[in-house]
Amino acid sequence: MDLSEHIAINRQLAESACQRLTEEINKLGFAVAEIKHYPNYDDASFILIKDPYTGQHNLTCYWYDEFKKQRIGSLQFNSDGTFYAEYDVVKTHPGKLTWFVEGVTAWGKADSIKAEAKLLPMPG
């Protein structure tokens, strides 16, 4: 299977994962103008990575900043139908100023997608 086939086959799950990451970012309560980029499947760069366990090639997606220099997120599909995604936020929590939001993560499979924010305590 070539790259374009992997992109097409994984589209529905990828769009659900992107939506879940976006919901998790929005739950944090940032003002609309504070978040400049959200994960969008069509904005990703795509590559196939060989799974060392199964030998199959799995789709991996990367998101980059507006200058295409710094990676700000990734979405990895696994041979068993699961995925893991993370997307950078890198901002002080809007409602809890003693916490820093590193990013959000999502994982699971089509019928069960979980997500959470990655929070770090601010240096005191």
Region spans (language model):
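Contiguous, amphipathic alpha-helical segments that mediate oligomerization or scaffolding
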Residues: 2-32, 36
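Ampiphathic alpha-helical segments that act as solvent-exposed interaction surfaces
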Residues: 10-11, 17-25, 78-124
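Amphipathic, interaction-prone secondary-structure segments
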Residues: 25-84
